[in-house]
């Protein structure tokens, strides 16, 4: 594992949480001084196995990532004017380092989402979550200590011209080399009567994305689900589905052999993503299907809004409610479950099975 987690092993500790992984270098260390600013404000972040980051906040006014910036190493100042895409990327490791970047890295490590040699299709819907995920993955790929490849995949399920233009414009602004392919999903969902259009749309989207990603030689697709999605889904399954289950950080595809789905923003809170978008003056696409344009409320969206409201209300009495919901799914005690299944295809087991076995002993 040295090749993956490098510095963590040498420091004798496992990088278990997003916070607390970094050490501040002493400015007096000549080898780590910034020649552009004389060592003022140099900070060396040691992010085990995912690329070292040196951020200079001194008079040099430049940022060197992984120590690989030639201009910075040789003492030449880089142009201070950065593109919107560069500013958005830089903000991930500066202003939003704790709230976004560290949590993104923490999720990738804790759940082993990315491995050497992976070819990952980042699936971009045009919303804030997937767009920010794409920038995180782009930055990580540049400075990771092990090689992996990334494709930026956009499916057009029937967007209106203005909505598609918004996605393309944001991709240009963020300097994301997207691949766009088309599917008839909106038209199909629009004609289906009854059932949940959001559920059907999500299932069809995933199938098309798996298929296109596999055709590009990818072994994983990355989706933009975040911390809030996880806890809201957990509550929805209990209150609306009469079962206890959650959104996993990764899973194997059942219909596409060798393919996996990963959720690198698993530990990132939605408020951080919203703030990042506003900070960089970005406007993202909302749900743009024809069904929701004609309907004031639809079942799944309404239920999710209700979960947001419920969690916010409970947090007024206990500020740790959200993290406790999240952690509860990491600490399930099956011995206290009246009934359980070990997967969607498994039969329902009762606590009486083992209870009666103990009586016979």
Predicted regions located by residue number:
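Catalytic subdomain that performs nucleotidyl-dependent activation
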Residues: 149-150, 228-310
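ATP-dependent adenylation/nucleotidyltransferase module used to activate substrates
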Residues: 10, 79-244, 248, 271-279, ...
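Short, low-complexity intrinsically disordered segments enriched in small and basic residues
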Residues: 2-38, 44, 49, 53-69
């Amino acid at each position: 594992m040295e090749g993956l987690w490098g510095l963590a092993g040498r420091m004798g500790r496992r990088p278990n949480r997003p916070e607390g992984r970094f050490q501040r270098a002493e400015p007096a260390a000549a080898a780590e001084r910034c020649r552009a600013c004389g060592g003022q404000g140099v900070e060396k972040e040691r992010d085990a196995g995912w690329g070292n980051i040196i951020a200079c906040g001194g008079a040099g006014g430049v940022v060197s990532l992984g120590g690989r910036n030639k201009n910075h190493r040789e003492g030449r100042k880089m142009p201070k004017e950065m593109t919107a895409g560069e500013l958005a990327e830089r903000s991930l490791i500066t202003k939003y380092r704790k709230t976004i970047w560290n949590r993104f890295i923490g999720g990738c490590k804790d759940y082993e989402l990315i491995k050497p040699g992976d070819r990952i299709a980042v699936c971009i819907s045009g919303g804030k979550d997937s767009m920010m995920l794409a920038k995180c993955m782009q930055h990580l790929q540049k400075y990771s200590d092990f090689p992996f490849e990334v494709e930026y995949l956009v499916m057009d399920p029937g967007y209106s011209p203005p909505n598609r233009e918004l996605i393309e414009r944001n991709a240009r602004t963020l300097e994301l080399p997207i691949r766009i392919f088309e599917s008839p999903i909106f038209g199909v969902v629009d004609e289906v009567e009854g059932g949940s259009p959001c559920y059907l749309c999500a299932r069809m989207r995933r199938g098309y994305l798996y298929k296109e990603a596999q055709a590009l030689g990818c072994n994983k697709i990355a989706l933009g689900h975040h911390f809030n999605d996880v806890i809201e889904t957990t509550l929805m399954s209990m209150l609306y589905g009469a079962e206890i289950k959650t959104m996993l950080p990764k899973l194997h595809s059942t219909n596409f052999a060798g393919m996996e789905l990963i959720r690198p923003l698993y530990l990132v809170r939605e408020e951080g993503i919203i703030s990042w978008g506003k900070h960089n003056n970005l406007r993202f696409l909302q749900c743009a299907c024809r069904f929701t344009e004609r309907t004031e409320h639809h079942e799944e969206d309404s239920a999710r809004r209700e979960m947001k409201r419920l969690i916010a209300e409970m947090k007024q009495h206990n500020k740790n409610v959200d993290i406790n919901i999240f952690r509860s799914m990491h600490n399930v005690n099956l011995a206290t479950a009246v009934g359980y299944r070990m997967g969607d295809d498994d039969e329902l087991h009762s606590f009486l099975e083992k209870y009666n076995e103990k009586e016979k002993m």
